[in-house]
Design a protein with these regions (language model features):
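Conserved NAD+-utilizing ADP-ribose enzyme module
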Residues: 3, 17-34, 45, 58, ...
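Short, conserved beta-strand segments within well-ordered enzyme catalytic domains
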Residues: 37-39, 64-65, 85-88
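Extended catalytic/binding region for NAD+/ADP-ribose chemistry, centered on the ART fold
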Residues: 54-77
């Protein structure tokens, strides 16, 4: 996965990219772990917002992105006007980041909680996406139509997906808009 906990201690300066195993100095902590993320939609989003809707999402309400450009393009293809917004992420080490390296029992429980309306305390959550098919399996599991074991048998054959939700206003400050592509 492109985003690893170790990357939280990758300091970025204007002159060079400096990788350190020591905890960075206070000034260096402000901008860390630079990477590119994409958001697919129907318009360019220069100033992302956390929109609270009636639909429950995998990791709760927030601004969703991915490191997989093709996935953002698939998200955009749902609309008449197809736009992929591009951002640099400069992670603030003070934020609470929850990362799921793969679809695990903990990942499933977290998504079930979020899709049931339960709030969490993380600023950013990273992990696999429950696409439409996986979502149907999760719904069947929640409804008791299939067991947990049956869920995993069905889910393990899906292709990899990735999502990052910026859940708080502080998390949104990590995003620096670079531009967009109209598809």
């Amino acid at each position: 996965m492109p985003w690893k906990r170790a990357s939280l201690f990758t300091s970025v300066s204007k002159k060079s990219l400096k990788i350190t195993k020591k905890k960075p100095k206070r000034k260096e902590r402000e901008q860390m772990a630079v990477m590119t993320v994409y958001h697919g939609g129907y318009q360019a989003v220069e100033k992302p917002e956390i929109r609270v809707g009636r639909n429950t999402k995998d990791f709760g309400n927030g601004f969703y992105c991915t490191v997989i450009k093709e996935q953002a393009q698939r998200w955009a293809k749902r609309y008449t006007t197809k736009v992929v917004s591009i951002y640099d992420v400069c992670l603030n080490s003070q934020l609470d980041v929850k990362e799921f390296d793969s679809m695990t029992e903990e990942w499933l429980d977290f998504i079930v909680d979020c899709r049931s309306g339960k709030e969490h305390n993380h600023d950013i959550v990273i992990g696999a996406m429950a696409d439409d098919q996986i979502y149907n399996y999760i719904s069947d599991y929640i409804d008791g139509t299939i067991t947990r074991e049956q869920f995993w048998m069905l889910a393990k054959f899906k292709y990899p997906t990735h999502q990052i939700v910026f859940y708080t206003k502080e998390a949104l400050k990590c995003l620096k808009y670079r531009g967009c592509e109209v598809l």
